[in-house]
Structures are given as C-alpha cells and as structure tokens.
C-alpha cells in the first residue's frame, strides 16, 4: 500500500522496528553521516539511529505530559502502556470537574482532556495508547479549584474514595461522564482508534461491571477495536481474576500499590520503607497467578511499575512467567528492550539445550 500512496522522490523516514513510515526526515530517528576523513563537511545522507532488537515481549512506554509525546514517540516502543490523565488535570484544567459543571463550564474538561489525549494518540499512531482514567485521591481533588466543596476529608485517602468507586457514585458520575466524552471525541471526531482505556483501583467485580456498563451507555462499547484494561493493583484483582476476566481485555499490574497492599507496607513511611520490595515471593506468586489465570481466558497482562527497569532479575522473572508486555518510563525504553531480548534469547537457548537454570523460588500459588 505504501508503494502506491507515496509519490516517487518523496523524502520519508522508515521506522522498521515499529512498522511506521513518517513523512519527511524525522531528525530524532536519524543522524548525519560522519564527516569525510579528508576534512569535508558532514553530508546530508542519513543512517539508521541506534539499532534495537526485536522482542516477543512488547515494550510499552509510560507518559504523563502530552507535550512530550512527539519527542518520545520516536523511541522504539510498541505504544503507550500507561498514559496518566492526572497531568492534564493539574497542568491544563486546574479546576474540580464538579465545580466546572456547577459553574456551567463542563466543556472545559472535555476540550482539555481530548486535546491532550489527541496529542499522544497522534504522535504514537498507529501504535496503541492506553489511557488510565482518573485516579486522584480525595486529598488531590481538594487541591483543584473548588474541590474543597465536593471532597471528603479522609484519614487514609490512599484507601479511600478513588478510582472506580468514584465513577458510578451518584455524587461523581456526571464528572466521570466528561472523561468518557473526551475519550469518545478523540476516537470518533479525531479518528484515533488506537485509544484504549484502563480502569484503576477497582476493588470488586461488580464495580467493574458497573463501569463497563456505564461506558457503553456513553457510547464506548468494549470490543475488538476498543480495549478495556484493569489496573491490577489490589489483591482482590489477583484472587478474583477468573471473574474479572469477563469484563476486561487485559490487565496492567501496578506493582507499587500491589506490593504495598500485599505486604501491608507503606513505601512512603521511612520506618517500614525497607520492607517494601516488589521482588518479594508473595508479590511474585501473585503476579504469576494473575498471568496464568488471565491467559486461560485469552486476556493479556502487562506491568507498568518501575521495577522491571530497575531490577534486571525481576524483568527476567516476568518474561519467564509469560508476561505479554512491559511498560517503562521513556529513559528506560531502549535499555529494557535490550535486556528483555537477552532474556528471551537465554530462555530459547535453555529450551533447546535442556540445561537452563531451575527456578530458585517456588512460585506455586
């Protein structure tokens, strides 16, 4: 198709890793040919940027600031595994959604959210973008203009009114509908069908059903071209994965909250912070169990915490457990892809020779 759509003589940049053709010369993907040894100036011929290996495990990227999407979109990632919506709220919207509704300005939410999301989808297209819907805690919502009128004072906001529990609550549902309108605008008006969504902090299976039903009522029907992911960050998501499966297309493990809740350990508390460790056997068993149960029903599993890029042994554990994708910060995309490629090669070699190292821990659930 490209050979007929691109006119002869046109300058293009081909990203062979991701299967993308860019119009013109994309400076971030190419570098100038070195100056001739005779002392001549650098030529205009371009050569490929740093080569990166192809991996069976998809390497996604985490992103918060939409204005950085074009810059980081040139990285050899397979898409956005976690787009944080909160950055748009604090940087461009500034005001509590219920306050904006009360003052007659709900369109401000839809316009700002859709514009930020559009930038990311456009920069990454046709690669998928997974938007995590709002996950502010009540204390963070109170910091938005007008928020003190609508938000409770919670002694433990981390475990309070956040994530999915807000979406269907009569006190907040109209605000959540604005988020869904923004998603629909990006997909339908702007035409970026590479946008999918992720539901954070969903404690119960019936909550997940309520959220999926609510999205359908707002014109966002889960299907082949619109995926709904669940942020697996609560032990109930792991224990009841066989039931959550019927309402989701996949999971993205939020290793920070999941570790904290499994270990009963506040990583922000200096006294017990040393006990916080994603590599603890309890966490590993939970992750491996989730992958097995999800795969049984054809669901995919990703992880979007920092652990895979910080601890090479943890990344190896994930690949050996069969994880489908890993999402890391932009500065870790290339190094993580290289490391994962080495792990996959090692696994293949061990399989061929039958002389691989046995697991040193028992991951049986």
Predicted regions and their residues:
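Conformationally flexible catalytic loops at phosphate/diphosphate-handling active centers
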Residues: 1-7
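Short, Lys/Arg- and Gly-enriched loop/turn segments at beta-strand edges
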Residues: 6, 18-26
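Acidic/polar low-complexity surface segments
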Residues: 27-32
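Conserved alpha/beta-domain cores
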Residues: 33-365
């Amino acid at each position: 198709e490209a050979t007929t759509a691109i006119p002869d003589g046109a300058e293009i940049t081909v990203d062979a890793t991701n299967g993308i053709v860019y119009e013109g010369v994309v400076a971030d993907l190419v570098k100038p040919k070195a100056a001739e040894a005779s002392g001549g100036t650098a030529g205009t011929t371009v050569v490929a940027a740093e080569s990166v290996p192809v991996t069976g495990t998809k390497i996604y990227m985490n992103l918060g600031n939409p204005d950085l999407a074009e810059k980081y979109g040139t990285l050899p990632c397979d898409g956005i595994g976690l787009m944080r919506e909160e950055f748009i709220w604090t940087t461009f919207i500034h005001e509590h959604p219920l306050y904006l509704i009360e003052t007659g300005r709900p369109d401000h939410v839809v316009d700002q959210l859709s514009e930020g999301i559009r930038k990311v989808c456009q920069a990454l297209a046709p690669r998928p973008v997974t938007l995590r819907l709002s996950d502010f805690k009540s204390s963070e919502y109170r910091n938005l203009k007008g928020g003190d009128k609508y938000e409770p004072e919670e002694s433990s906001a981390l475990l309070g009114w956040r994530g999915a529990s807000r979406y269907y609550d009569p006190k907040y549902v109209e605000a959540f509908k604005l988020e869904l309108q923004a998603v629909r605008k990006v997909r339908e008006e702007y035409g970026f069908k590479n946008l999918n969504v992720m539901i954070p902090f969903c404690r119960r299976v019936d909550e997940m059903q309520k959220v999926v039903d609510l999205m359908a009522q707002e014109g966002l029907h889960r299907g082949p071209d619109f995926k709904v992911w669940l942020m697996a960050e609560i032990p109930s998501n792991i224990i009841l994965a066989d039931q959550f499966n019927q309402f989701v297309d996949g999971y993205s493990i939020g290793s920070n909250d999941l570790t904290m809740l499994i270990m009963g350990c506040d990583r922000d508390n200096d006294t017990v912070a040393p006990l916080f460790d994603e590599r603890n056997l309890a966490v590993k068993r939970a992750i491996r169990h989730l992958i097995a149960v999800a795969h049984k029903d054809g669901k995919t599993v990703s992880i979007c915490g920092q652990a895979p890029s910080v601890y090479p042994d943890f990344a190896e554990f994930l690949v050996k457990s069969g994880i489908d994708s890993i999402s890391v910060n932009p500065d870790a995309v290339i190094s993580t892809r290289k490391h994962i490629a080495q792990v996959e090669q090692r696994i293949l070699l061990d399989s061929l020779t039958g002389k691989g190292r046995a697991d040193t821990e028992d991951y049986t659930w």
